[in-house]
């Protein structure tokens, strides 16, 4: 087994677990498979996590922290104005689906229906992560409106909730139908929701 510092071993377990969950789901990922894939002894797992559920919570918190960081960078310093950056967020997922025929890297899409009825702690971690995404979108909408690069009806937070729910639903439908059309249709609707202001 490779030698890891204490932090590295925990991080390695979480990263390995995330990849396995993206492939098999949370219940489909056995601890034996996780430990074998990560090349970590069983005792080490329980040194860092009191249970598989606690591992799941930590995995989701890690996932959303990284997701929020990437989204923050895109919305704050990506190319173009705030409208361009919000649309780029959605376009990236559509491009990925068109290139690979699947949506990878999103634990919300993969695990939401599976774990929300199984674990209140994991549901709470997922809800907190989703609310973080919505808050970032809300701030970008508010900034875009103040900079006169986009317009929309209602309050930023309310509209961000709609945009997130629309895109999450499109992701799920694309996964079910194995078609990019739900994402394409949703993106077209997003463009109408956050319109370019009339000159």
Swiss-Prot record:
Site location (Plays a central role in response to RCS): 106
Under the heading Pfam families, the entry gives:
TetR_C_13, TetR_N
**What does the entry's PTM section describe?**
Cys-21 and Cys-116 form reversible intermolecular disulfide bonds in the presence of reactive electrophilic species (RES). Formation of disulfide bonds leads to dimerization of NemR, which alters DNA binding affinity and NemR activity.
Q: What is this protein called?
A: HTH-type transcriptional repressor NemR
UniProt source species: Escherichia coli (strain K12)
Q: Which PROSITE patterns match?
A: HTH_TETR_2
InterPro entries associated with the record: Homeodomain-like_sf, HTH_TetR, Tet_transcr_reg_TetR-rel_C_sf, TetR_C
Phylogenetic lineage: Bacteria, Pseudomonadati, Pseudomonadota, Gammaproteobacteria, Enterobacterales
Instruction: Report the DNA-binding ranges.
Output: 30-49
Alphabetical UniProt keywords: Disulfide bond, DNA-binding, Repressor, Stress response, Transcription, Transcription regulation
Which Gene Ontology BP terms does the record give? negative regulation of DNA-templated transcription
What does the induction field say?
Autoregulated. Up-regulated by hypochlorous acid (HOCl), the active component of household bleach.
From the record, what ranges are coiled-coil?
none
Q: What happens when the gene is disrupted?
A: Deletion mutant is more resistant to methylglyoxal than wild-type strain.
Q: What is the annotated role of this protein in its UniProt record?
A: Involved in response to both electrophiles and reactive chlorine species (RCS). Represses the transcription of the nemRA-gloA operon by binding to the NemR box. May sense electrophiles, primarily quinones and glyoxals, as redox signals and regulate the redox state by modulating the expression of nemA and gloA. Also uses the oxidation status of HOCl-sensitive cysteine residues to respond to bleach and related RCS. Involved in response to methylglyoxal.
Q: Can you give the residue ranges of the HTH tetR-type domain?
A: 7-67
How its function is modulated: the record gives: The redox state of the cysteines plays a crucial role in the regulation of NemR activity. Inactivated by reversible oxidation of cysteine residues in the presence of inducers such as quinones, glyoxals and reactive chlorine species. Also irreversibly inactivated by alkylation in the presence of N-ethylmaleimide (NEM) and other Cys modification reagents. Inactivation by inducers decreases DNA-binding affinity and leads to the derepression of the nemRA-gloA operon.
Molecular function (Gene Ontology), one example: DNA-binding transcription factor activity
């Amino acid at each position: 087994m490779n030698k890891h510092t204490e932090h590295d071993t925990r991080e390695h377990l979480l990263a390995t677990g995330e990849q396995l969950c993206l492939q098999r789901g949370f219940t489909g990922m056995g601890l034996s498979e996780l430990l074998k894939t990560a090349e970590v002894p069983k005792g080490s797992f329980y040194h860092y996590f009191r249970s598989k559920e606690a591992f799941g919570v930590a995995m989701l918190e890690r996932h959303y922290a990284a997701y929020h960081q990437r989204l923050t960078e895109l919305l704050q310093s990506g190319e173009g104005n705030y409208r361009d950056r919000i649309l780029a967020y959605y376009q990236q997922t559509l491009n990925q689906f068109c290139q690979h025929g699947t949506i990878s890297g999103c634990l919300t899409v993969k695990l939401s229906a599976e774990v929300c009825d199984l674990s209140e702690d994991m549901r709470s971690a997922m809800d907190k992560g989703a609310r973080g995404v919505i808050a970032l979108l809300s701030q970008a909408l508010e900034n875009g409106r103040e900079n006169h690069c986009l317009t929309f009806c209602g309050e930023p937070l309310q509209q961000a909730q709609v945009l997130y729910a629309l895109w999450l639903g499109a992701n799920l439908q694309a996964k079910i139908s194995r078609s990019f059309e739900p994402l394409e249709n949703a993106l077209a609707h997003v463009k109408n929701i956050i319109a370019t202001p009339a000159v």
